[in-house]
Amino acid sequence: MRLRVDLLPHGNYPDVVLVVDVLRATTTAVTYLERGADALLLTATPEVALGLRGAAGEGGVLLGGERGGLPIPGFDFGNSPVEAAAQNFTGRVVVMNTTNGTGAAHIAAQTGKHVLLAALTNAHAAARRARALASEEIAIVCAGTDARVGLEDVYAAGVLAEYLLALGEFRIDDGARIALTIRRNAGDPLEALSSSGHGQHLVGLGLGDDVRYAAQVSTSTVVPVLDATQTTPEVLRFVGG
């Protein structure tokens, strides 16, 4: 079994893919499902998200997303896991579009057999689910920030890799070795996330609570899983697994 870590999304994923955007899209996605959402729809663009609202009518779906860390005009929510954790989404469908994470999920879905969303908050559950599904390879895909490698995602990939290596034997690539090295040398999760460039950006926007929330490890058993039967090139449907 191969274990691969892509420090940025590259594509060509033949088996299981764990998409990581710890600050903040995949952390927020896990929280939406924890708080009762029936499904998450990750769109290719904000315009597609707004179109889904128009098609569904008032109250049909809720929109969450950001650009540059700030809420998208016309959306109901930003991309804040703290904000999401304070809501009740029971029975609702949440449509998401973000700067980095939703795009990484779309790249993964082009070829991946099983696509999961992973964060620190669900790291143990995501690793177990990935191992159970995999037949030849698990790829951990870091979303990065504006096409640049993000310390926070590589750190989270290292946490996931540690869990996976505890579950069985893998042939690891250089990306996995880099992620494991970062995990072992970047301090505790909050220190790693807070010292990252994107973490500092969010703190500067007054979103330090989101960074602290995202630094929690294995507090959730929810793993968003792509429902390939109800997915299109512009809209990916994830449900809790």
Swiss-Prot record:
Does this UniProt record's set of keywords contain Nucleotide-binding? Answer: no
Q: Which UniProt keywords apply?
A: Hydrolase, Magnesium
Q: Which domain of life is it from?
A: Bacteria
EC number(s) reported in the record: 3.1.3.71
| UniProt xrefs under Pfam families | 2-ph_phosp (PF04029)
Q: Which reaction does it catalyse?
A: (2R)-O-phospho-3-sulfolactate + H2O = (2R)-3-sulfolactate + phosphate
**Which residue windows are transmembrane per the record?**
none
Needed co-factor(s): Mg(2+)
- The protein's enzyme class: hydrolase
Kindly indicate whether the keyword Magnesium belongs to this entry.
yes
**GO molecular function terms here?**
2-phosphosulfolactate phosphatase activity; magnesium ion binding; sulfopyruvate decarboxylase activity
Q: Which family does the entry's similarity section mention?
A: Belongs to the ComB family.
Q: What name does this protein carry?
A: Probable 2-phosphosulfolactate phosphatase
Species, as recorded: Deinococcus geothermalis (strain DSM 11300 / CIP 105573 / AG-3a)
